[in-house]
Amino acid sequence: MGKVYDWFEERLEIQSIADDISSKYVPPHVNIFYCIGGITFTCFLVQVATGFAMTFYYRPTVAEAFASVQYIMTEVNFGWLIRSIHRWSASMMVLMMILHVCRVYLTGGFKKPRELTWVTGVIMAVCTVSFGVTGYSLPWDQIGYWAVKIVTGVPDAIPVVGPALVELLRGGVGVGQSTLTRFYSLHTFVLPLATAVFMLMHFLMIRKQGISGPL
């Protein structure tokens, strides 16, 4: 093992990277509430893993979506556990995100020079809520269907562009297969990619600027 490590160390300088990560200064005022962001990140990783596992069995069609979810819950080995963990961690992610935003706001972590860190965090908060809205519809049961119908109908109240936005979200005049396809694409590709990009930016800025000082 020593020779393998030496081979990688010679080429990648792993030890210097590890020393840089482990030697980062942590202000003395930091407490357990500063870990909430990390918990949110952990929930996101759980979501990615369990969600990816379910894509092997889920079928994003109005005719088969509900049956495929039932199949995951009753026939797939540990499918019920994977889906349950996905649901529980989704709720936990939203809760931790709210607590993290409150902690940052109350401790002044959004002030100069960390405005952009705050902006990326707000964008990720919007993505998190969007995960919930799009994921709620995927079983395509009565609750999911009517939730989509109500949510996609909200922009209709916007003057001039409202009807066009509704049609864009639904993929047509009414809620149907095009709507489910769009929500599935948003939930499994667009939102995870956007969240990962802004999360990387968020972490890099925190790494560069450090943790904000006490009020």
From Swiss-Prot:
GO BP term, example: respiratory electron transport chain
Xref: Gene3D superfamilies: Cytochrome Bc1 Complex, Chain C
Location(s) in or outside the cell: Plastid, Chloroplast thylakoid membrane
Keyword Cytoplasm found: no
GO cellular component: chloroplast thylakoid membrane
Cell membrane is among the record's keywords: no
Record GO terms (molecular function): electron transporter, transferring electrons within cytochrome b6/f complex of photosystem II activity; metal ion binding; oxidoreductase activity
Binding site for heme b 2: 86, 187
Required co-factors: heme b; heme c
NCBIfam families recorded: PRK03735.1
Subunit structure: The 4 large subunits of the cytochrome b6-f complex are cytochrome b6, subunit IV (17 kDa polypeptide, PetD), cytochrome f and the Rieske protein, while the 4 small subunits are PetG, PetL, PetM and PetN. The complex functions as a dimer.
Family that this chain belongs to: Belongs to the cytochrome b family. PetB subfamily.
Function: Component of the cytochrome b6-f complex, which mediates electron transfer between photosystem II (PSII) and photosystem I (PSI), cyclic electron flow around PSI, and state transitions.
Protein name, entry field: Cytochrome b6
Gene responsible for this protein: petB
